[in-house]
Amino acid sequence: MVKALSARFLPSPLRAGWAFFCLTLLLSPPALAAECVILLHGLARTEASMNTLAEALEAADYWVVNYHYPSTSQTIEELAQQAIEAGTAQCDPGSDKVHFVTHSKGGILVRQYLHDNTIDKLGRVVMLGPPNQGSEVVDKLAAVPGFELINGPAGLQLGTGQWSVPNNLGPANFEVGVIAGSRSINLILSTLLPDRDDGKVTVENTRLEGMRDHITLPVTHPFMMRNPTVIEQVIYFLRHGTFRKTGPLPR
């Protein structure tokens, strides 16, 4: 049987070296801390909506950037350039990978940016309730007085028509998993949607050509990013590139 080498049996110079090695191990950050995760909230929300998810990712040893951007003040093209570049600049310079976890419109910002740009060390992307094919809610309410005031120019770009931004960005050219919600707490908006939905986006319209994986969970659009199962699936996808379909999720 091989026994562990005890430092007290080492010569004095080696003892000092052993102590330094052990101290280095104790002070070294966990391996996953070298991976950065940028969080992008949805339309008319703030970074506070992603706080629960941010805390869970930090507990999983990721470097987390929970970035706030003025979601109702500019177009998707302008917001994408601003948010992605500012977010990546806040990652640890030593990060081996840069992941994204987005809610709703935040996913469209990532698609818009990667349509025209590349990101060094890009890892995986998880989108929560993204209107990847637009939302019928925008189609039917865009002309209603006050809609643009509340949702801004970017909100008007999220319809389902051929003119909408999501429908002009093409297939995913990056590794992405999509989580859709199938419950609604907004029954009025759900009446405007033709299929299973989360109160803002149909399950079908969250799908994106070229995506790596897709799951539907019984969660609502406004609060899915706080749901424990959603959070577990986010972390699982970041680590494995797929969602967990059967059995309990590892803790």
In which residue ranges do the predicted regions lie?
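Helical cap/lid subdomain of alpha/beta-hydrolase-fold lipid enzymes
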Residues: 115-251
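Bacterial N-terminal signal peptides that target proteins for export
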Residues: 2-18
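Serine-dependent carboxylesterase/thioesterase catalytic core
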Residues: 35-41, 45-48, 52, 58-70, ...
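Generic preference for hydrophobic/aromatic residues in regular secondary structure cores
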Residues: 7, 11-12, 93, 155-158, ...
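N-terminal signal peptide c-region/cleavage motif recognized by signal peptidases
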Residues: 28-30
